[in-house]
Amino acid sequence: MIEKIDHIAMVVRDLDRAVEIYAKGLGLEAERIEQSDEFQVRMAFIPVGDVHIELIEPIGPGRAQDFLEEHGEGMYHICYRVGDIEKAMKKFGSTLEFLDRKPRKGSAGALVAFLEPGSLFQVYTELAERKNEDLKQQDRA
């Protein structure tokens, strides 16, 4: 059901600065930057092997802004790739609580759903179904 870790997300106050730090400090370049009006965030995606680091800067009210205000910058969520998100939600929903009642459109054309943090040790957890293995090949959200 879970195929792999898709990405690890971190909330930052200044996305441009964070992208620069990853590039200069670790030699890791962002392959794309995009904005989600639905989630009220700007995001940068940095490939590390077959997993991505997602840097998230809140640009308005929402979960990411709430997290930043409560916890400061840092680890925000982990995302697991699933083959069929509706089946995964049905299977996992019998023991875990979802924040999303149905999948939503996420970055790069993925279908995504978030679990209630209390379900998995206070860690935001996202499930993502992607049609293509390569995140950068997806249609832009």
Q: Which stretches of residues belong to each language-model region?
A:
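Vicinal oxygen chelate
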Residues: 44-45, 89-141
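A cross-kingdom feature marking solvent-exposed beta-strand/loop segments within repeated
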Residues: 4-6, 28-40, 59-76, 94-112
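Long, charged/polar, surface-exposed segments that mediate recognition or autoinhibition
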Residues: 71-72, 86-90
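C-terminal "cap" of GNAT-fold acetyltransferases
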Residues: 36-51
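Amphipathic alpha-helical segments
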Residues: 16-29, 88-94
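Short, structured motif recognition centered on aromatic/hydrophobic residues
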Residues: 5, 12, 22, 46, ...
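Short loop/beta submotifs within extracellular cysteine-rich repeat domains
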Residues: 29, 53, 63-64, 122-123, ...
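N-terminal beta-strand motif that seeds the catalytic metal site of vicinal oxygen chelate
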Residues: 1-19, 75-82, 131-141
